[in-house]
Amino acid sequence: MAEAEEKRVGVGEARAPLAVEALRGKIVEKVKGNRVTLIVGDTGCGKSSMVPQFLLEENMEPILCTQPRRFAVVAIAQMIAESRNCQVGEEVGYHIGHSNVSNLNSKRSRIVFKTAGVVLEQMRDKGIAALNYKVIILDEIHERSVESDLVLACVKQFMMKKNDLRLILMSATADITRYKDYFRDLGRGERVEVIAIPSSPRSSIFQRKVLYLEQIVDILKMDSESLSTKYCSGPNTAADAGLKPDVYELIHRLLLHIHQNEPDIGKSILVFLPTYYALEQQWIRLLSASSMFKVHILHRSIDTDEALQTMKVSKSCRKVILATNIAESSVTIPGVAYVIDSCRSLQVYWDPIRKTDSAELVWVSKSQAEQRKGRTGRTCDGQIYRLVTGPFYNSLTDHEYPAILRLSLREQVLMICCAESRAMNDPHVLLQKVLDPPDSDVVEDALESLVQIRALDKPTSPRGRHEPTFYGCLLNSLPLSFDASVLALKFGDTGSICEGILISIMLDIQPLPIVQPFGHQQLCKMYRNNYFEEEGIDLQTGKKEAALVGNLCAFQFWQRMFKDKYRLDCLINVVNTHEPKASNGFVAKPEDEWCAFHNLVPTALNYISEIYDDIMGTLHRFRPSFLVKINPPMYLQPSEFHHMCLRHEVLELENVNSLPLEAENSHLDSHRRCAATPYVSPADFGTTTVVKTLKTLIKEMKTQSAADRVTYRELVHGYVQPALENEMCVFFLNGSCNRGDTCHFSHSSRAPRPICKFFLTLQGCRNGNSCSFSHDSGSLVSSSITSGICSQENRATSVCCKRLLPAAGDGHILVMNDKSLQFACKLCNYYDPTKIIACTPGPHSFESDSVTKGLKILQNLADPSYLFIGGEHKLSVPWTKLSRVFWFADIDSNESISEQVVLQKFFQHIAIKTLSEKMSDLQVIVIMNNAKFVQLQVERLARECFLFLGESFMFDEATLGWFSDTPNYPRGMQVSAPVAYIFSMHPPTGIQFGDYASELRKVLYSN
């Protein structure tokens, strides 16, 4: 009777008061009075969203909040911003990866949400200064990622020095005793205050009911024999966690049962599955019920904006959310009344045999299962279906195994060694202070591995520490995973840094540029083949490699076709209006339509562009030697690349009976595709060269990682001398060789086995030691062990004058922005003064004898457009004879913003002049401090005007003039010095965009 009398709140009605709101005063009081506060409350009590606001309203700000997943960071920040009637990025902001949406409008955000990884990077670079907050909230502390554990340890270390810092730990399922013990040594008299948030009064709480396999099969009227064997492969967690077809079928029947028996169509169903493949398999089974459900997918490969669509309540069709553990914690999905929990998850671990990270399906912990349970009963009553028996559930571990005990820790050890603060730069010390310290042998193995690849130097004394090398510092500073960073720098040493960065980014991110229609594998392959079909080149590639190259070609196609067209339009607009227009400010709709027409994801393309610029900025700060000579992007070849779109309706394959899918298949709505396939042929964009380089570098990386278990037979002149005996016959190995003694290969069991072709790919061989083929890299070139270790540019080898000036005195030189004329006058010592024209941004008073005779001076040209357009009839510049244009950027620190605008104008107008007059041989040289070069995003500004960086080297101040610009002292092994950057024009293809030169000339001279 009591249950019947309880208040029920339906979907769409006003929410009941959150349990945490009743403890507002106590929470604020305890946080003010204690340095560490542990808040424990059931999922859905309002901890994540309300506690930061309680503190903000008491002026305890700024506040830093961490969340384990990007999706949660964005969703909670948006929710709080909406509730406080402000825009995200103002009072409430967030920072995930390369997206920093905080501190907008020149004001610091008062609440900032970040992932643990972002906080860790900031502490590495800034030390205690990264914790310039009054309160730090570490949410969902039960999720034991390596980053979360390290953030906790580092914050604890810095709290020893920062007494005014307040730390709040929050979770629904954390082991309270462990965390209280962990902070026991924080200081004398310190205590960890624990606040337990009780359930709301029974009159307002939503009810949750948990059912196990025994009850589920009874409800569905299914056979109840051997449930654990049929659905769990065994009676306890020792059983294989793989998903059998029976499990998918059970979920399908359960979905239909819920739909048929739940009259409120607004009540949604959330299904937890461990992998993308499992999500697809379940989705395929739902095709027959396409009229009943609107399906959403939550997976890391789904764009964040698309994933947030799951937060919208559906009133026209029942919403089914198929999700991995991305939906496990922090975020409330409105209207979820049912949770189906497969009780499996995907766990990453270090495979010492394959020398790579591997993944396996495992059973969840009780803590994880409780988190999944908490996804319902938050905005309505809920039922939870756990696809294990009751006794099986009782055998689950209480908490998940910490990731820090499962991984190799190479990346983390390198990060610690590169940290600026002494409080966290010793891996042996810091890693012993985490909640679950890894074995010291694991740390030592990671250090030895990093020494082997020359990322660290060995200690010079028994008590010394491992110091990072230049290569190690650069590896650690790139915003990429460890292996992706290694690959990018190896590409740099081959002269293909542009392609290397793009491929490395695509190793790390999801979604990728090419649309992957969910549940349509053949369609996915067809879309990829439109950009790269490996059958078109005589090179065998692995599955991952083919996907990477295909997406690289797609990105390059977008650059050549869509972006180049937009860049041209921007330049024409500049001539018409005499105002600069930012090339990244285009209207989203035309790009969305163009991308849909070519099966591309616009958000992924633009995200990759942002990361690319970030990585290039890091390289320019460190100045590795390969920046001295940079090959232009391969997508510029052939120069006359052409693609003519052909409109057609979607193919039969795309018109299959499909489920309304809100995330990935929204691109199918337009029903129009470009039929001019393939969009990119194997001959375009240097694809064959890229594939060869990628395969070679992956082999090097595999050899390098396996070097500690390679025994070389003989080392001769920098390569490994193979064994004299012939390689073992592959057919003999399989027991099928019928050539006997006439076989050219060995039939001896001692003969070297052929190298496994999968071992030398990104994915690696899954068979490990049981593989019939060899994983011994001793037969490979040993130079790969030490090649690709990039070094810093040698400042002592400056040959500045020879590289800056035209050969044999051929051509005129235009020097712009030379405030004191010192650079132009110095150039006159090495070049004919009568062929040099110097421009000053303002009026210049000078003694006649201080200026070289014959040097032509143009004054008051602060706006470069006057020289190229407005004042052309007055200012005589021999444009057709120009060979070099210099921009001498000796910038004061307070001029940065205005200088960026002026530089943008300079690049735009030099591009307009160059393209209209077809002066493609003209070189544009910017001389600027490298730190300012990065800060002002000069390379991006130039690239948006078809000017690509080809060379860069240290500027010889002693010979050509001293810089007054002295930025802050650089961090670590970064450089801060004037550098000469040489740009060359790579015009867009005339075949594709018509006679744009004539159009530019017409507009230019009509003004």
Curated annotation (Swiss-Prot):
SUPFAM superfamilies associated with the record: CCCH zinc finger (SSF90229), P-loop containing nucleoside triphosphate hydrolases (SSF52540)
Zinc finger (C3H1-type): 723-750, 751-778
Sequence motif: DEAH box, positions: 139-142
Sorted UniProt keywords: ATP-binding, DNA-binding, Helicase, Hydrolase, Metal-binding, Nucleotide-binding, Repeat, Zinc, Zinc-finger
PROSITE patterns linked to this entry: HELICASE_ATP_BIND_1, HELICASE_CTER, ZF_C3H1
Superkingdom classification of source: Eukaryota
Binding site for ATP: G41, D42, T43, G44, C45, G46, K47, S48
All copies of domain Helicase ATP-binding, residue ranges: 28-192
GO MF, one example: zinc ion binding
Occurrences of domain Helicase C-terminal (ranges): 250-420
EC numbers: 3.6.4.-
CDD domains for this protein: DEXHc_RHA-like, SF2_C_RHA
Name listed for the protein in its UniProt record: Zinc finger CCCH domain-containing protein 4
Record organism: Oryza sativa subsp. japonica (Rice)
